[in-house]
Structures are given as structure tokens and as C-alpha cells.
């Protein structure tokens, strides 16, 4: 009875807060503490319910109400948990993006940790192939120096140095002979005439070694022929004719270089069958045939260009007609390209006059007139400036 009186003397706000804080726990404790002689008075938290039911209620009805509230609360929490998946999906997508970023971080850290070991391995590989790397750098430097010098001498025309051209010829020939003499035991010069060098077993690096050296030597050989043409006096072979010879030699060099690596690569591809079973041998034959087909397609793809070069070389198309003195006087007798008096003036189809040598050098790279941009030449005459292709034919 004292406990019930204490409940009566408690302020309504306190009872309301306790009921709101733990309604189910309060109902259970109340139900468990009832005795036959005690009187329990239910204090409702809502004013509406208090006005409708001023009398005391059955404890079980309070328990049921509390149970209903607990079930309703659980249902609401369950409904909220089902309404959250879109947020969860957004969170998962964010985690996926952060996961991919973390993978890149791990990869970067792995590279940082592995860098010393990669350097050690790289130094070891360089030391194993130091001869080939040094020789490749030397051949490339020689080619760049000779190619630039030949182009400069062709551009100078009558002012070119015969001594410089002779030095380039001796330098290229001496470099080739010294290289083959140093490695005479391998008979690398055999590959120039479509024969295999004297190597028992060809590995991948040895194939690259043979093909690379042969390609540079062929370039040196045709560059030496260009030096010989430079040494020919202009009264025997005009500069215009020399340009056509440079173009023809370069095209011949490129087509010859297409076929030279074929025997070496064919032997390397087909050599798999010597140490394997029938399947491996068949695979080697198939790879070799596929290589030959690709080389033939490459050749026929360049055949059209080669025919155009031959047609230009034999027909020697003109860009105009010789200009008269009256026509030159109308142009003040000065060539707009060289800013000097006309030397063998040529009247283009667009009625502009230039020196024959000046306009020939111009059309080595361009198709249009220098002044009015009228198309005069149908094709660009490549390689007439004496240049050599820097492409390395490794296959």
C-alpha cells in the first residue's frame, strides 16, 4: 500500500517521462509486484485517454497496450531498416571507388618497394648485353651523323664540299668493314645475300643482333652510293638529275631491306620443330608460313609507291616551260625563292617564274606554287633531298 501511495504522490510529469522511457519494463515490474491486497492505479500518459477512461484499468490491459506498443515500435524499426537499401547501395559504390583507389595505392607502393630490385635486374641485363647495346648506340650515332651531312651537302648544291663527301664515303665504308671484321667468326655478311650466318642455334636476341646490324650496313651502303653521286661534277650530272637518283636509290634500299630479314626469321621460327614433337614442329611451320604471307602483303602494299617512283624517274616530269627574257624582265629578273638573278628560269602553269634548281628543290617537299598555292605537282617527290629513312627494319 505504501508503494501505491508513492505512485500517487509522484508528479504527473515524472510518471510520464518514466512511462515514455521504458513502457514495457514498467508494465512488467508493476505486474510482478502486485499482491492480493494492493490497489494499482494506472496513470495514462495521454490526456485524451485520461479523459475517456478516468477510472483505473486492468493491469493486463496495460500489459497488452505495452506489448502492442513494443510490436508497433519493432515494426517501425523494421520498416526503417527496409527503407535504407538505397543509402546502403550508395555507400557500397563509394566503398568500391575507394577500393579501386586503394588498389592503385598498393600497386604504387609495390613499385616503390620493388624499384631497387628492378634496377638490379636491369643492370644485370645491361651487363649481359653490353656489347649489343654499345654497338647499337654507335651504329645509330653514325647513321644520324652521315644522314645529316649528306642532306646538308645536297642542299648546298654547287657550294658542296667534295672533300666532305669523300670523307663521308670513307667513313661509312670503314665503319662497315671494321664491324664485319670484328665479328668475322659469325659471318654476319652472309645475311646481305639472303644466307644464314654461321650460328648453330638462333635465339631471339641473336636474331635481333643479326637483323639490326644488317639493316644498318645496308643503309650505310646506299648512303655511300649517294656520296658517290655527290662527287659527280654538275656538268656531267645536273643537280636536278641527282635528285631523281637519290629518290631511286632510297626506294631500292627500302625494298631490299624488306626481304633481307626473311631467311633469318624463317630459320628462327621453323627451328622449334628440331627439338619438339610433331605438334611443335607443325606450329613452327605454321608460324613461318604466316610470316611469309605478312611479308608478301607488306611488299605488295609498297609496290604501288615503287611504280610511281620508277615512272617519275624515267619520265622526269616538268613543272613548266622555259621562260623568255621578256617574261623574266616583267618579274624584275629576280627569283622570289633565292632572291638572285634567274638561272634557267622556268615558267610554271600558274604564270610564275622561278629558277629551275630553286623550284625543283621546292617541289621535293611541296605540291603547290610558292606564291599562289596552285597545285602544280600531283605527288610529293620524297627522298630527292638525299635523306635516308631512319626506320629500323627488324622483321
Curated annotation (Swiss-Prot):
An individual GO BP term: protein autoubiquitination
Pathway: Protein modification; protein ubiquitination
Primary location recorded for the protein, binned into one broad class: membrane
Transmembrane residue ranges: 118-138, 165-185, 193-213, 216-236, 258-278, 283-303
EC number from the UniProt entry: 2.3.2.27
Principal EC category: transferase
PROSITE patterns to which the protein is assigned, alphabetical: ZF_RING_1, ZF_RING_2
A GO CC annotation given for this chain: endoplasmic reticulum
Record flagged with keyword Transferase: yes
Chain spans, region Required for ubiquitin ligase activity and for protection against ER stress-induced cell death: 328-379
Localisation: Early endosome membrane
Function: E3 ubiquitin-protein ligase that acts in the endoplasmic reticulum (ER)-associated degradation (ERAD) pathway, which targets misfolded proteins that accumulate in the endoplasmic reticulum (ER) for ubiquitination and subsequent proteasome-mediated degradation. Protects cells from ER stress-induced apoptosis.
Protein name: E3 ubiquitin-protein ligase RNFT1
Source organism (scientific name): Mus musculus
Gene behind this protein: Rnft1
Amino acid at each position: 500500500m505504501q508503494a501505491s501511495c508513492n505512485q500517487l504522490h509522484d508528479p504527473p510529469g515524472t510518471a510520464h517521462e518514466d512511462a515514455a522511457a521504458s513502457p514495457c519494463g514498467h508494465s512488467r515490474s508493476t505486474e510482478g509486484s502486485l499482491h492480493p491486497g494492493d490497489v494499482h492505479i494506472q496513470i495514462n500518459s495521454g490526456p485524451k485517454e485520461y479523459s475517456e477512461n478516468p477510472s483505473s484499468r486492468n493491469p493486463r490491459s496495460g500489459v497488452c497496450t505495452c506489448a502492442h506498443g513494443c510490436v508497433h515500435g519493432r515494426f517501425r524499426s523494421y520498416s526503417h531498416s527496409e527503407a535504407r537499401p538505397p543509402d546502403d547501395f550508395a555507400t557500397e559504390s563509394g566503398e568500391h571507388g575507394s577500393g579501386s583507389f586503394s588498389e592503385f595505392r598498393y600497386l604504387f607502393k609495390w613499385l616503390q618497394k620493388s624499384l631497387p630490385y628492378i634496377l638490379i635486374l636491369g643492370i644485370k641485363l645491361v651487363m649481359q648485353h653490353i656489347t649489343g647495346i654499345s654497338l647499337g648506340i654507335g651504329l645509330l650515332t653514325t647513321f644520324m651523323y652521315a644522314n645529316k651531312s649528306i642532306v646538308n651537302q645536297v642542299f648546298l648544291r654547287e657550294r658542296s664540299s667534295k672533300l666532305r663527301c669523300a670523307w663521308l664515303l670513307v667513313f661509312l665504308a670503314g665503319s662497315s668493314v671494321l664491324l664485319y671484321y670484328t665479328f668475322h667468326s659469325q659471318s654476319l655478311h652472309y645475311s646481305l645475300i639472303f644466307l644464314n650466318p654461321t650460328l648453330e642455334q638462333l635465339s631471339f636476341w641473336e636474331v635481333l643482333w643479326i637483323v639490326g646490324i644488317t639493316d644498318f650496313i645496308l643503309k650505310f651502303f646506299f648512303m655511300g652510293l649517294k656520296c658517290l653521286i655527290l662527287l659527280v661534277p654538275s656538268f656531267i650530272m645536273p643537280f636536278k638529275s641527282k635528285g631523281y637518283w637519290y629518290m631511286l636509290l632510297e626506294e631500292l634500299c627500302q625494298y631490299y631491306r624488306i626481304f633481307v630479314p626473311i631467311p633469318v626469321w624463317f630459320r628462327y621460327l621453323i627451328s622449334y620443330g628440331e627439338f619438339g614433337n610433331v605438334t611443335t614442329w607443325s606450329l613452327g611451320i605454321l608460324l613461318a608460313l604466316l610470316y611469309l604471307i605478312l611479308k608478301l602483303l607488306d611488299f605488295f602494299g609498297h609496290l604501288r609507291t615503287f611504280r610511281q617512283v620508277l615512272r617519275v624517274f624515267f619520265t622526269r616530269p616538268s613543272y613548266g616551260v622555259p621562260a623568255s627574257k621578256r617574261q623574266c624582265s616583267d618579274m624584275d629578273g629576280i627569283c622570289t625563292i633565292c632572291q638572285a638573278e634567274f638561272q634557267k628560269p622556268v615558267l610554271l602553269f600558274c604564270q610564275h617564274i622561278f629558277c629551275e634548281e630553286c623550284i625543283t628543290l621546292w617541289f621535293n617537299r611541296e605540291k603547290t606554287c610558292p606564291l599562289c598555292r596552285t597545285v602544280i605537282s600531283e605527288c610529293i617527290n620524297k627522298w630527292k633531298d638525299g635523306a635516308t629513312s631512319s626506320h629500323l627494319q627488324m622483321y
